[in-house]
Structure formats: C-alpha cells, structure tokens
Amino acid sequence: MKEYQIHLELDRSQQNNFLYPLLFREYIYALAHDHGLNRSTIPLENGGYDNKSSSLSVKRLISRTYQRIHLSIYAKDSNPNQFIGHNNKFYSQMISEGFSVIVEIPFSLRLVAFLEGKEMAKSQNFQSIHSIFPFFENNFSHLHYVLDVLIPYPIRPEILVRTFRYWVKDASSLHLLRFFLHEYFNWNSLITPKKSNSIFSTRNPRFFLFLYNSHVYEYESIFFFLRNQSSHLRSTSSGLLFERISFYGKVEDLVQVFVNDFQDNLWLFKHPIMHYVRYQGKSVLASKDMPLLMNKWKYYLVNLWQWHFHVWSQPGRIHINHLYKDYIDFLGYLSRGRLNTLVVRSQMLENAFLIDNAMKQFETTVPIIPLIGSLTTARFCNSLGHPISKPTWADSSDSYIIDRFMRICRNLSHYHSGSSKKKSLYRIKYILRVSCVKSLVRKHKSTVRVFLKRLGSEFLEEFFTEEEHVLSLIFPRALFTSRRLYRGRVWYLDIICINDLVNHDKLEIVPN
C-alpha cells in the first residue's frame, strides 16, 4: 500500500475569451474562414444538427441581435429585461446558439493540431461506437469484475458555471452562461429529451451538450489521474467526449482540470489491469481485482462526485458485477463472459486422458424485453409483444409505409448485427413485418389473408433477407461467406450513434 497526497492545481494556459467574438462580430467571420478549421477532419458545422448553428448563420443572427438592441434603446417604453426574457425567447436562443458555436472553436483547433501532430489517418472508423465491442472481446474476456456506473449530473446550474470557469478568462462569459442556465435551465432535458418541453431540448441541444462535455471531461480527468496513480503502467488514455460534438482528443496532461477538494489522503493499491469505457451517461470499469478493490473504486467515485461536484450519488447508480455471472447493459447490448468447455483426448503410451479446457469468450445478445418496450412506446406492438397497426401512417402511400418499416427493420438489423444469438432479432423483425401488414390492411379496409395474397410472398421475405443481401454485395464472389457472416457476429464501423429504439437507457436515467 502506498499513500499519495493529492495536490491538483488548475492550469489556466488553456483558457479562452469566449464572449469577445460575440461583441466583435468580424472575429467570428474570420474564424469561419480559418485555414485550420477548413483542414479539420471534423467540421465546425456538425452533421448532427441543423444548419442554423453554422458560424455564418450565427453571424447574421448576431447582426440582427444588434439591431434589436438599438431598437430597444431608442424605444420609449423599452424594458431592459425585455430583450432577452420570457417575452422574447427567440433572441435568447440566437445568442445561445452563437455562444455554443464559439466555445467549440478552441476545441476544434486543438483537434486539428492533435491530428496533425500524431499524423492520424482520416478514417470514420475512429468515430464508430461499434468499435467498443471488439475492444471488449479482446480485453474483457480474461477479467473478472465490472463496475457498471451511471454518471450523475448536477441539478443546480451554479455547478455547471463552476465547472465551465476553468475554460474561460472573461467573467462576462460566465455571467452570460449563468443567465442562460437560470433563465431556461432544465438539465433533465439533456438526458431525457422526449419527456421535456424545454426550449433547449427542442431548439438548442448543442448548448447543453457542450456543458455536459465540460462536466464529464473534468470528472474523467480526475478519474484518469487516480487510475494512473494506482497502475503499474502509466499509460496514455484516449478520451472521446459526448456523441458527435466534434470533441476528440488525447488526455495526456491529466492535471489541467483539477481541484483541491479532497480533504483526506487517498490510499491506493497497485492495480495491474484496468479498462474504462463510456458512452453518454453510462460507463464501464473492468478489472481483474477482487471485489474488495472494486468496492474501493466505488467508494472513491462516490466521494469524488460528492466532494468535488457536490452531487449526491445514490448507491444504486454503481453496481459491481461478475463478468461471467451478470450481464452488462451497454449500448443496447447485453454482454458477458462465457466459459466454453472443450474436451481434448490425450494419448500417452498406453494411457489415455480426457482434458477439459475452458475457453473464455465474450458474447453479446439483444435485450429483447427493453427492445419490445421501445416498440410498444413507438406503437408497433402492445406490451405483450403482439404486433399492432400504425394508424398515424394511414394517410401515407403504400410505398411510403413499406419503406418506413423496411428502413426501421434494416437499421435495427444493422445495429444488432453483432449479436451472438439471432433469434431475438428475428422476433423483432416479425413484429415489424406484421405491424406493416396490419397498417396496410387498416388503410385499405381489408383482411390480412386477402392482402397478403394480393401482395405476394416476396414481401414477407424482404424483412429477413435484407441484411444477407447487403453482405452478399460486400462479398459478391462468396455467397457461403456472406451467409455465414449473417448468421455470425458482424461489427459495422460506420455506426457513430446509438439507435433511437435501442436507446432505452435514456428512459431509465432520473435526476438524483
């Protein structure tokens, strides 16, 4: 056992003046044509959002905002609080969008410098979330215990302002941020956007996602510091921030965003192996250690959240699971280790021996019950899994209805192609197929038997052969290979976000 006295200081060399581009409008126009940003492999205008958040559009919005300010000044009955408030949320949204774009610019420039320094290949596979599962297969099969962690998030706006102050120089940016948070704050909308009517949940999620990035980045930086202090090998860790917000980087200087809020000394054991993976608000910490040491890490995480982030973490947010007994619910898959016994007959002179070899594998399956719950919420089936019609699509054309169902079925098959057992996936396809037929029958006021007889049996086969057809295009000269891959596990490295129907974890995260 070795004692470490932690003294972490803030490195302010990375701070920026974020509000000045809003005050001096030409600066943001120059940034839009910056040569470094144009070379970036991940553009400033992120593809996951609409074009309203582009830098040039924000420049126009800021110009209109200045005109609004002059009109408010010269108006006789002008109210200083009327410019941005409940009576005029549009201009508040305009400024928040501009603020969101500007605060992402320094991180985009860091990304350009990082990619050029490392000479990293420009590949979309770098963004794929399915690349996590090959990592599980290669590194988790020989481990024993896993910490299944739901990262808590602050429910008070001032905590976010406190976190964000490490990135800024000008106090005016903090005041503007504090105004946005106190005026329209609804942190629950970030995790459960479907249940919230907040203006940011429907019109400007980019602003809150950046704040969530800042919050999680600070937590992970401190966690990586503790991990490196307790590891034999001080490895460099790669960090990927929340979804597709143009934030990729290398966590090398792990003392940039730290504080001195620990009141006790940390007693750390030497850990030979530890792996950490996170997506959105859920993370997995795997180790070969005994449950006692995993409980130690659970204790450290809870104290980190409470002492530094002032967030009360319920004990149920961290579970210690045995990798070969319990499942890991992560990215829409149920994953766990599996021991396969292989009997080998050994002959030595006149004696024969039967040797049992335990082969460790990492299997991934489709969580059928949560997925049926998502289909029930989307009105494709009832709570028992029986297919029902989709009345909201009754006014659409037949080709549109069939195309919508085929697209949903194809996306689910594509996302769950890495499942070890295809039986659950076949059941989901069956629900979507019958729901499509019932929707068409309801539209034409006919019966299922008559409609299928008129439509033909080819329609029923398309739902099951679509993925195999895609693999046959990839391997056109090896039909047997494509069929074998279809029955086996295939990880597609073009998937960069979780499927909406698969993302049932969102509905389970609640504030502390």
From Swiss-Prot:
Keywords: Chloroplast, mRNA processing, Plastid, RNA-binding, tRNA processing. One of its GO terms (cellular component) is chloroplast. Coiled coil: none annotated. It comes from the Eukaryota. It is found in: Plastid, Chloroplast. One of its GO terms (biological process) is tRNA processing. InterPro entries: Domain_X (IPR024937), Maturase_MatK (IPR002866), Maturase_MatK_N (IPR024942). GO terms for molecular function: RNA binding. The keyword Flavoprotein does not apply. Its main location: plastid. PANTHER family: MATURASE K. Usually encoded in the trnK tRNA gene intron. Probably assists in splicing its own and other chloroplast group II introns. Belongs to the intron maturase 2 family. MatK subfamily. This is Maturase K. It comes from Acer campestre.
